């Protein structure tokens, strides 16, 4: 697991590392409500799920083949990479492969989280973010949910959304 500021070079493929060379600490992530853990054993994930009342989960594999071919895969990656927020926490545990979550800091700068097998990321509801795979084009992830599994993305801008407003208030305190 590695965190750093995104280089914002849009001339380079979104699946490239985009490492600006400016690292981000766990403390900086916590200030924006992002939690990150490394759990080599799924039993650790089960304990966290019980503590945080995550009652449902599923698994998703993202590859060109799993998405029904290259064209569908590229369309799906574009959807994931569009900046958005959710009204629920987003919890992802990487079982295999790797991917990137980009989250906005308090100054609206992108922080990139490089996640590999065993890494778990919790994004608070209301945070603007996006996801993409690495250049390996493969990730197998477990999604955890506090209620029924759902994935409703609200594209930016939705600053008047009550979950967004609550999030901004929480990180401004």
Swiss-Prot record:
Superkingdom of the organism of origin: Eukaryota
CDD domains: cupin_ARD
Pfam families: ARD
Keywords associated with the record: Amino-acid biosynthesis, Cytoplasm, Dioxygenase, Iron, Metal-binding, Methionine biosynthesis, Nickel, Nucleus, Oxidoreductase
Cofactor note: Binds either 1 Fe or Ni cation per monomer. Iron-binding promotes an acireductone dioxygenase reaction producing 2-keto-4-methylthiobutyrate, while nickel-binding promotes an acireductone dioxygenase reaction producing 3-(methylsulfanyl)propanoate.
Catalysed transformations (reactions): 1,2-dihydroxy-5-(methylsulfanyl)pent-1-en-3-one + O2 = 4-methylsulfanyl-2-oxobutanoate + formate + 2 H(+); 1,2-dihydroxy-5-(methylsulfanyl)pent-1-en-3-one + O2 = 3-(methylsulfanyl)propanoate + CO + formate + 2 H(+)
Enzyme class label: oxidoreductase
SUPFAM superfamilies on file: RmlC-like cupins
Names of required cofactors: Fe(2+); Ni(2+)
GO cellular component terms, A-Z: cytoplasm; nucleus
Its job: Catalyzes 2 different reactions between oxygen and the acireductone 1,2-dihydroxy-3-keto-5-methylthiopentene (DHK-MTPene) depending upon the metal bound in the active site. Fe-containing acireductone dioxygenase (Fe-ARD) produces formate and 2-keto-4-methylthiobutyrate (KMTB), the alpha-ketoacid precursor of methionine in the methionine recycle pathway. Ni-containing acireductone dioxygenase (Ni-ARD) produces methylthiopropionate, carbon monoxide and formate, and does not lie on the methionine recycle pathway.
Family statement: Belongs to the acireductone dioxygenase (ARD) family.
Stated name of the protein: Acireductone dioxygenase
Species of the source: Yarrowia lipolytica (strain CLIB 122 / E 150) (Yeast)
């Amino acid at each position: 697991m590695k965190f750093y500021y995104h280089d914002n070079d849009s001339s380079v493929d979104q699946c490239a590392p985009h490492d600006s060379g400016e690292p981000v600490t766990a403390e900086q992530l916590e200030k924006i409500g992002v939690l990150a853990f490394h759990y080599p054993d799924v039993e650790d994930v089960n304990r966290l799920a019980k503590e945080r009342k995550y009652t449902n989960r599923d698994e998703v594999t993202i590859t060109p083949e799993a998405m029904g071919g290259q064209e569908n895969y590229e369309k799906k990656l574009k959807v994931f990479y569009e900046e958005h927020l959710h009204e629920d926490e987003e919890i992802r545990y990487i079982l295999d492969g790797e991917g990137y979550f980009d989250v906005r800091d308090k100054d609206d700068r992108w922080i990139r989280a490089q996640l590999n097998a065993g890494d778990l990321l919790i994004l608070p509801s209301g945070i603007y973010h996006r996801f993409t795979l690495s250049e390996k084009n493969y990730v197998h992830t477990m999604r955890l949910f506090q209620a029924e599994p759902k994935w409703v993305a609200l594209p930016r801008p939705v600053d008047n959304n009550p979950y967004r407003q609550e999030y901004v208030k929480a990180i401004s305190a």
